[in-house]
Design a protein with these regions (language model features):
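Aliphatic-rich helical/repeat scaffold segments used for oligomerization and domain docking
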Residues: 1-220
Length: 220
């Protein structure tokens, strides 16, 4: 059976604002992806913690490591586990196949590829782990980066739990310049300036900003 035809990989979604924080995770995951035995990495955490944004930042960071690039597959609208292969095929711009052939078609397309497959919001269809297992078994140069609220429970899965961004102690109020050392504060200022460019961190508003970041537990 010949490999299905596909066009160039879909572009990685991008953001106009600067990525803030997660330096430790970026370094650790980058190092992991340079190791030959790393096949599957899962970014774990509750909704809103920043898993998707970190996955996209990682995709940009490690793009040069993969001869055939990055394939980003958003799964937030998918409700049936059987459709995982179909959505991967869509991002590959593959031509139509019979529904029962999608997994095999994806494997045939990727088996000689050296790429990073990013599966975003996999908790929607966590039962699709068996398909991921098959892709990894038959596509030896494919690595997979998953974002999920739930582990896949595969033997070679490497988990990276995410928590809130760094923030100051609620009882301590250093000056505005020192506060900007904390990722949650820097992100708050960035978002505030996006809607009100004149906003700046001052002695007057700093306690309120710290309080907000604490109440949000450092969530982006």
């Amino acid at each position: 059976m010949s490999s299905p035809r596909y066009e160039s990989l879909a572009a990685i979604p991008s953001y106009s604002n600067t990525f803030i924080g997660r330096g430790h995770h970026i370094h650790a995951i980058h190092t992991r992806l340079q190791q030959a035995d790393t096949r599957l990495i899962t970014l774990l955490g509750p909704g809103g913690i920043g898993k998707t944004r970190l996955a996209l930042r990682m995709a940009e960071e490690v793009q040069a490591l993969f001869r055939d690039g990055i394939l980003f597959v958003p799964l937030d609208a998918v409700e049936e586990a059987d459709l995982l292969s179909f959505y991967i095929a869509q991002q590959l711009n593959m031509k139509s196949q019979k529904q029962e052939d999608w997994l095999q078609a994806v494997i045939l397309s990727l088996q000689e590829k050296e790429l990073l497959l990013v599966l975003d919001n996999l908790e929607q269809i966590i039962q699709s782990a068996i398909q991921i297992d098959q892709i990894l078994k038959h596509c030896p140069k494919v690595r997979i980066l998953v974002t999920s609220r739930i582990v896949l429970d595969l033997s070679y899965e490497i988990e990276y739990p995410l928590d809130g961004l760094s923030r100051p102690n609620a009882n301590l109020f250093p000056g505005p310049i020192d506060l900007l050392k904390f990722d949650a504060i820097r992100l708050f200022v960035q978002k505030a300036q996006a809607s009100k460019p004149s906003f700046s961190l001052t002695e007057a508003n700093a306690p309120h900003v710290v309080q907000i970041c604490q109440k949000l537990d450092g969530l982006p």
